[in-house]
Every structure is written in structure tokens, then in C-alpha cells.
Amino acid sequence: MMSDYNWFEGIPFPAISYQREILEDIRNKFVVKEEDLLILTYPKSGTNWLIEIVCLIQTKGDPKWIQTVPIWNRSPWIETDIGYSALINKEGPRLITSHLPIHLFSKSFFSSKAKAIYLVRNPRDILVSGYFFWGNTNLVKNPGSLGTYFEWFLKGNVLFGSWFEHVRGWLSMREWDNFLVLYYEDIKKDTKGTIKKICDFLGKNLGPDELDLVLKYSSFQAMKENNMSNFSLIKEDQVTNGLKLMRKGTIGDWKNHFTVAQAEAFDKVFQEKMAGFPPGIFPWE
């Protein structure tokens, strides 16, 4: 079991597959190209679902690409050593995934016309999902209990740091024309409507049948059965108890796990940390 994180600029990263030199190069040297598309999220926000939807939009619903190429090759995580080397050598438009907070992301992006989609999810559900997910990997120290992980999460002592700072940082770009903010809860409630919104943002015109195919092949069940998307190909030495990337994918699962005291404590921290945002911006509030 990894005893600790790999810290960089005050942010905890997994102890393997993440290198300080690469993180520095991403921020200072990596050039985001105009034709690139960025998928930005805090971990456990529905990243893989969004990647699957975007990939299917690009193929107009044809599932061949998503069923033959692993998800981390279709849209590599730039902050991993493998992802970074794949991206710097890739020609043409690139799909780029990242969990990096805004202050660690490539400086070149902020003066480019590249489009980015930022996906936000209720942090309470992220906390519960993260607890069950990370506890089954060898990538981080095991909290042992949800109560311990709860405390870590509120303090930002979890992978990729504070959810509150991550979301505050990236949402500062929400008025930019090349930046689309999506909410996991909205995708769950109206998947087809969200797919159309992404198509509009990307300038893609899909017919009704093509939209239905995107919907079909990006469903929870379809992704769960797709070995290119469910992370079943991941190395066994990084997994302890049979990693399940796709556990539930539901909204409000935190209510099954938080105590009343935890729910109240979380509400208090949320109100403090997210003060200043317009009322109603978060669909779960």
C-alpha cells in the first residue's frame, strides 16, 4: 500500500504515474492547440461518461472507436506520464482529459481558442464515490473508514486537492465563449438534452438517429459492459479488491452514507467555501 501522496505545489497526486517534471512542463511548456478539445473535471465527477459521450458525438454514434480503443488512449489524462507522452507526440486535433486545478493547467490554454468542457458534480456524491473507488486501489493510502475520508475531503487532503478550490477556480471561466460548464445531475436528468448542448458547443450537427446512437452507447449499462471504457484492463498491481470504476452512477447516494452530523458539517463548509456564487448555480442545492 502506498503510504502517502506525491505532492506538487500543495496538491496531492498518486504516488505512481505522476512526475514533478511533467507537471511543471504541462504548466509552462505544453502548447494547447486551437483544434484541441479539453475535458476538465475533479475526480469522480463523471469524467469517463463525458469522454464516452464526446467520443460518440465525434463518430456520430458509431461505436467502433469506443469499442476498440481504451478510453485513456482516446482522451489521455495529460497529467499522467503515459498520457503526457502520448499527447505531445499526437498530430491533429487532440482530446485531452485533465483533473488538474486551474493554476496547474497549461498557461497556453488561457490565450488559445481551444474549447473546454468542465463537468461539475455534487461534492457529497463525489466524496462517497471517491471513498469506495480509491479504497480499492494501490494508488493512495487507504482511509480505513468513511469518517476519516470525510475529514480528509473537507480539508482538501485527497487526490487533486480541494473540490471547493478546484470548482471555484475553473468556474471563473464560465462566461468564456470557449468554455462549457456541465453538471452531472443535469446529464442524468436529461442526457439527450445535454448531448445536444455539447453538439451545439462543438458545432456538430447530429441527426435524430445519430443522437439516439450516442445515447445508447453512452448509457451506464453499455459503458459497464465495454471493456475499453470500464477500466477492467487496468494493471492488477494497481488494484486490490476488484476495482469498480462504475459503481452506481446515481444522484444523492451520499444520503445513504452521511450521518446527520456529517451532512450538517458538510453544509456549513460548503456555504463558507462557495460563498459568492449566484443562487441556483448548483443544481443540487
UniProtKB/Swiss-Prot annotation:
UniProt xrefs under Gene3D superfamilies: P-loop containing nucleotide triphosphate hydrolases
Main location: cytoplasm
EC number, UniProt record: 2.8.2.2, 2.8.2.14
Uppermost EC category: transferase
GO terms for MF: 3'-phosphoadenosine 5'-phosphosulfate binding; alcohol sulfotransferase activity; bile-salt sulfotransferase activity; steroid sulfotransferase activity; sulfotransferase activity
GO terms classed as biological process: cholesterol metabolic process; steroid metabolic process; sulfation
GO cellular component: cytoplasm
Binding site for 3'-phosphoadenylyl sulfate: K44, S45, G46, T47, N48, W49, R121, S129, Y184, S218, M223, R247, K248, G249
Catalytic activity: an alcohol + 3'-phosphoadenylyl sulfate = an alkyl sulfate + adenosine 3',5'-bisphosphate + H(+); taurolithocholate + 3'-phosphoadenylyl sulfate = taurolithocholate 3-sulfate + adenosine 3',5'-bisphosphate + H(+); pregnenolone + 3'-phosphoadenylyl sulfate = pregnenolone sulfate + adenosine 3',5'-bisphosphate + H(+); 3beta-hydroxyandrost-5-en-17-one + 3'-phosphoadenylyl sulfate = dehydroepiandrosterone 3-sulfate + adenosine 3',5'-bisphosphate + H(+)
UniProt keywords, alphabetically: Cytoplasm, Lipid metabolism, Steroid metabolism, Transferase
UniProt tissue specificity: Highly expressed in liver.
Pfam families: Sulfotransfer_1
Active site: H99 (proton acceptor)
Keyword Ribonucleoprotein listed: no
Location within or outside the cell: Cytoplasm
Function: Sulfotransferase that utilizes 3'-phospho-5'-adenylyl sulfate (PAPS) as sulfonate donor to catalyze the sulfonation of steroids and bile acids in the liver and adrenal glands. Mediates the sulfation of a wide range of steroids and sterols, including pregnenolone, androsterone, DHEA, bile acids, cholesterol and as well many xenobiotics that contain alcohol and phenol functional groups. Sulfonation increases the water solubility of most compounds, and therefore their renal excretion, but it can also result in bioactivation to form active metabolites.
Quaternary organization: Homodimer.
Family (UniProt): Belongs to the sulfotransferase 1 family.
Protein name listed in UniProt: Sulfotransferase 2A1
Annotated organism of origin: Mus musculus
